[in-house]
Amino acid sequence: MRPLTPRQAEILDLIKRNIADTGMPPTRAEIARRLGFKSANAAEEHLKALAKKGCIEIMPGTSRGIKLTQEEEPEDLGLPLIGQVAAGEPILAQEHVEQHYQVDPSMFRPSADFLLRVRGDSMKDIGILEGDLLAVHKVEQARNGQIVVARVEDDVTVKRFEKRGSTVYLHAENEEYSPIVVDLTTQSLSIEGLAVGVIRNGDWQ
């Protein structure tokens, strides 16, 4: 392999750490933000250079289309468990990862990308309980009726998704809780993933 420049080595290390911590590569925008580039295009140029040197493969058509070559593949650390999520930061940002669990992502359909510890009892009627580890498949869109991990403004919540026009209703599965109503014309909402399974608290240490 041809030698890397210091900047290329820094980017390659960032990619490896992101995959080890979150199970997926960073986006171009995330690379640019973390390393202080002015735009995602600057990150793209460095990625092309790494691809030419045989460190990575670039897969077109996806923001996370970066694959390490076999000799660069990091050790599998398992699924990351996400803790408290800081305002404005990606849910899979490295600083949010509390630890990793040796759970096979293919146990779930679709496969899980990360785990989220359940807080509260708002989803207890469908068996999602306080302290459970919720297996989550990373997506950015959802269909009505799906159980989602959603970010409303700066809060992350697990609820059943329903969209009517420009209004989203995030329904609890506990009659003691009212729906969270989000007016998309004035509030920000993003889907962080779909719930694909539960690991009961105490079943996996």
Swiss-Prot record:
SUPFAM superfamilies: LexA/Signal peptidase (SSF51306), Winged helix' DNA-binding domain (SSF46785). Keywords: Autocatalytic cleavage, DNA damage, DNA repair, DNA replication, DNA-binding, Hydrolase, Repressor, SOS response, Transcription, Transcription regulation. The record marks A87, G88 as: Cleavage. The active site is at S122, K159. InterPro entries: LexA, LexA-like, LexA/Signal_pep-like_sf, LexA_DNA-bd_dom, LexA_repressor, Peptidase_S24_LexA, Peptidase_S24_S26A/B/C, WH-like_DNA-bd_sf. It is an enzyme of class 3 (hydrolase). It catalyses: Hydrolysis of Ala-|-Gly bond in repressor LexA. CDD domains: S24_LexA-like. Residues 28-48 bind DNA. Its EC number is 3.4.21.88. GO terms for biological process: DNA repair; DNA replication; negative regulation of DNA-templated transcription; proteolysis; SOS response. It holds the Pfam family Peptidase_S24. PANTHER family: LEXA REPRESSOR, LEXA REPRESSOR-RELATED. Homodimer. Belongs to the peptidase S24 family. Represses a number of genes involved in the response to DNA damage (SOS response), including recA and lexA. In the presence of single-stranded DNA, RecA interacts with LexA causing an autocatalytic cleavage which disrupts the DNA-binding part of LexA, leading to derepression of the SOS regulon and eventually DNA repair. This is LexA repressor. The gene is lexA.
